[in-house]
């Protein structure tokens, strides 16, 4: 596609065949064609639209392609199970009350830039919120704050990556934000094979020997999209390999809404591991409050990166989040969110229990392996026709990686129970009736 478009063989405005038609013509899987179309769109070579098709966009300007949005726009007439949105448990009223209390009682000025003194209460509250059981003993000075987990991950990558073509290692299926971050930083992204316990140490070592690598970016507690949890033994093996190969580790814990018993990698190798999370999935996405516990001796460097990038979080956000965390309101909200998510998971498992579903009661999405006859992209397209939006495995595959026949269903807690249950029932009906088509 790239060569044909750039040579002029395919002219601007030419409509490309539908995915399944082109797959049939070429004798390849629809998933492969769908990924090629998606990558071409990210490079600006083609333009796509629901119900419109895929058209040649002409010559792309390198570096200026507009990729798919990470935050999905919710359509009022559709049931959106693409993004794991924080359930409404009354936090809106709590946050409004905190804002009102701060407006009445705060003494410092909102005129100047935030500084180390005005940031300290939020850093201290975040350190206490994370706790020593998760990341080992830390002080507020070990905490660096960012605008949500995604931006905080990018900040950590900016701190540790160097050279003209840095290498990031990650899981073979990864949250799309990982691809966006790697592209933004002009880094090579290498996928590492996983099993039921997480990233395989033998495959990680093989990748390190073959490609090198400055950083391993992973989600050890809650992997998106598969719900996999990396065992403690496996985490210890990964930490040992990181020491052997002088590898930095960035653990993205943004999907964890509970208080896990096992330590994060930051506790196992504090000299080289970053722990990153946010309040997005457990309290509120609107606050855009992320935080990193940096490896020993690297917090000041990360703060310099943050200051160079965006000067720091707005002081009102710092004050609101510090109050939510220190007052106990954030913990009360988190516990309510955890209970609501468990209810949503129970409903999903009851509706889809006869299918191959991976789930955990504390994870706001399930991983559905499709029965024979369905592929991720075709099932997602069929769901879209029913006004149900889901994410196919193709959206989590790395550019050169393979995608299993599976989809991720985020458990949207902000629609009525009747609509939610109806959507799950419809999904189960569709799974039982795959399309009658040739399986390449």
Residue ranges of model-derived segments:
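Hydrophobic residues in well-ordered beta-strands that form the structural core
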Residues: 170, 191, 249-251, 321, ...
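PLP-dependent aminotransferase class I/II
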Residues: 274-351, 356-360
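Conserved core of the PLP fold type I
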Residues: 109-245, 256-274, 432-439
